[in-house]
Curated annotation (Swiss-Prot):
Component of the 1.8 MDa SAGA (Spt-Ada-Gcn5 acetyltransferase) complex, which is composed of 19 subunits tra1, spt7, taf5, ngg1/ada3, sgf73, spt20, spt8, taf12, taf6, hfi1/ada1, ubp8, gcn5, ada2, spt3, sgf29, taf10, taf9, sgf11 and sus1. Signal peptide: none annotated. Residues 130-142 have a biased composition (Basic and acidic residues). Essential scaffold subunit of the transcription coactivator SAGA complex. SAGA acts as a general cofactor required for essentially all RNA polymerase II transcription. At the promoters, SAGA is required for transcription pre-initiation complex (PIC) recruitment. It influences RNA polymerase II transcriptional activity through different activities such as TBP interaction (via core/TAF module) and promoter selectivity, interaction with transcription activators (via Tra1/SPT module), and chromatin modification through histone acetylation (via HAT module) and deubiquitination (via DUB module). Pfam families: Bromo_TP, Bromodomain. Residues 311-417 form the Bromo domain. The gene is spt7. This is SAGA complex subunit Spt7. The modification Phosphoserine is found at residue 475.
Amino acid sequence: METNFEDSKSLDEPVLHDIAIALLKNDYWSLYLSPEQKRKYISILNDTLLWNRFINVIEWDKLCDEKDSNGSNDDEEDDLDITTLFRCRCMIFDAKINPALFDLSSTSSGSIEHVDHQNISLEASLAEEEERKKGDAKKSEATGRQLFDDDDFDESDAEDSSKATITLDLQKDKSLRKSIIDLKSVDIDDMDTSGFAAIESNKALSNISFNYVYYTLENDSENINEVKKFEDEEDTSTPNTSSFQNNSSSLDLSDNLSLNSKFGSLTSSFKYLLQYLEGNRSKINATDADVKQLLSDVKKNKSKWANDQRIGQEELYEAAEKVVLELRSYTEHSLAFLTKVSKRDAPDYYTVIKEPMDLGTILRNLKNLHYNSKKEFVHDLMLIWSNCFLYNSHPDHPLRVHAQFMKDKSLELINLIPDIVIQSRKDYDDSLIEAELESDEESTAETSKHVTSKKTSSRGGQTQQAVEVHTDANSPEENNTPVTKKEVETSKPPAVSGSTPPVNEAAVIESSNTLEKEPLSDVATEYWKIKTKDIRESHILNNRRILKSLQFIETELPMIRKPTAMSAFIDREVAYGSIDCLPMDKGDFEPIMKLDTTPLLEYDVGSGVPMTAGSVLETESEEDLYFRDYSLFEINRNTPGVPSLMYKNIAKMQEIRKLCNKIQTVRQLQLPQPFYYEHHKSHVPFANNEPILLDIPQNYDNMSSFKPLAHDVLKKLCTIILFHAGFESFQMGALDALTEIAADYMAKMGAVMDQYLIYGKDKSQQEIVGQTLGELGVDDVNDLISYVYHDVERQSVKLLEIHQRLQRHFVELLRPALSERNDEEAIFNQNGESFVTGNFSYETGDDFFGLRELGLDRELGLDSLSVPLHLLQSRLRSNMSWQPEATIKGDQEYAPPPKYPPITAESISNEIGLIQGFLKKNLEEFGLDELLEDEDIRPRSKPPRPRLPPNGKITTGRKRIASSVFLNQSLRKKRCLKENEQGTEVTTLPEE
């Protein structure tokens, strides 16, 4: 098609056409277009009608269809598409709206000649030049944010073109405005078609625009495997960066191939491990190389079949032995095949069967290293079943059923044996050398065969030479060259005998075609993929963590937007709008907003959706700071509310326990038995000053679950409740059980309240809380108030009263109880205790009480022994305790009642007649003038313990001899003998 812009009047936007040419000449096209899209862009610039329809957006869909059906097109690569038209138009309008982003001053030298348009006069051009200079001066002082509006891309207004400032210098000489440069003379292949080379060399690298379109997220599938690897490494804390790089080229365990077919040489030893891996293939994120490495690590170093001189023997024989032992273990069917057939059982067996075989013989052949390949082993194994079928030819013979079962089982187990031919060390080394030489020769011949050719670009006709596999990646025609199977086989390295599996030729051909046929995407998309890779991976990680615990609701009422609920979205929008497109210093082209922090709107699917009810605290900004200060949530005795009261009650309980221990200690001193202090140790005081510190990690925003942290806090709160209930100590198992019960109760409460918040939006917060507590067993909120009042607040008053009573009782115990009763304790004053306890004998070296002779000093580990004073005091105390209560003086609130009159002989007549006889009898029996009351009678004292003699030996009373039986027998014998002497009959003694 002829191109003539000389007389063209159809160009509505001549300035845009000049900008388009300047972008092409200054290599700014590489920021938006790929090399293929560049060729289409040139065809649009060279065609007047095409340019007019392109710039005015006139039936683009029909335009693409016409280009596809036009037979005059020599190349399919020049077929227009909507994506190319959109990116070309976007590039032109970006340069028009923000000329500061593009340095097009080089076009003023005359490399691009301006078009002489009849509707633009020289005076208008000069006026526009002056306006352009003024606009440039203003734009150099201000910086703004690059805005992308759909209206800017679709409207071409004459008023906008008059106001737009263009850096192109208008040529004052009309003679220079003849025609546009012939773009056919531009050699496209000589230009930088890589796209990124121009980007790296250009100062406008940081100003590549890629946020003006929405990108689909299918490219994230490339990062899924890397994200899974990262999650596994995050759990195990063992990073493996090399697996990220090789993950795209490795096969996943989710393939349809079974593990037994992939690792046949290793599966015989790890049957159960592979069964587990096979059953959990969807949960295990590991490549085939990882599984093979795992099996190699678990496998023991060397087996009994290892032999360095016979390559492949260890793997072959180990697998074969496993198969034989597995077959022998099926005793239900294998009993007839374990040993040779006896001639006694089958006399004609060896006549019919010329080559007998059994499992025992195969096992002996393995021990004798009889087999050199899998084929030989399988032959002997199948010979067992064929011999059985041959000898037992009757179809209903029972052994045929067993043989068929064993044959099927052996065919299943044979797949686990690697196809290996055992070689000697010398033959194996020779084969490696030959294979290496052959691979070098074939690679040299293949390299000389593949020659690339350069394609010439022309509009009239293009010639193209046949190209082999290795071609330039920039040429789409060359990329479509198929790869033959012969070439793949030629480039394949020679196989070495062993367990190495053969190369899948179809997979190689398919992967080669896929790589070569994959077209290059546009520069902006590639730039977006590279620069947003890290942030996209972080988005995927966060989304996967959230989805683990997220529950979707099928039916949901519409959300009501409120200022507090939309605050997060508004703050983010304001923060994004405050970022300038260019830095303050125009000479420095480093952007303020880095690409790592670029917001991806594709992932922000809920940017305009308010948060759910209950998730936003409707408070003022000053109060928001309160909830961000984690130190305010430390729970200790100074915390206001119920926890502080509980801490105070617990502290008061500890003081009461200490006081009880002191009282118990004083009472133990009054007892005669020994007292051991370690049996009554005081309780460890409760750490009431230790706060609950929330150990919030630094990366708490990326934590998948706060369950461990919440569990620890709840356990501490349960501990406080148990101490407040009166428990002195408890087992950790009981505490964990109580914590789990409380956690389950709180989780149910949250779930019920969440349902009410979602479906009960017409109810108030008080009603929601009341109904939630009612479903969980709390009938009324007043029950909670009663618990706080009676069990927490009033308990502090009760504990204070108990502490005061115990304090008074302890003071009374410490007073000298016998100071006003008797002065006999004066004998123990002035160091008189040493004469009583025996301490004076320690200085003289005598053992006064014989305690050292008894070995008590060695037994108790004491240097000096003495009788405890409380033994003597207890006896004295018992002697003095008979005194009536009347002698004890004390302050009493009320006077005691008067005593009853004593009963005498004269007063008996005043009593009732029923007891007069009893009273007279007691008076006569005791010979008393009056009867004593029971409380006036001195208590009967127990007999005193025997004292130790001076020698220190403890003696016991003589034991009584039960001689009555023997005495009676001797007396009866004497009587019988006496009667015998007197002539009476002798009788035998009766046996008892």
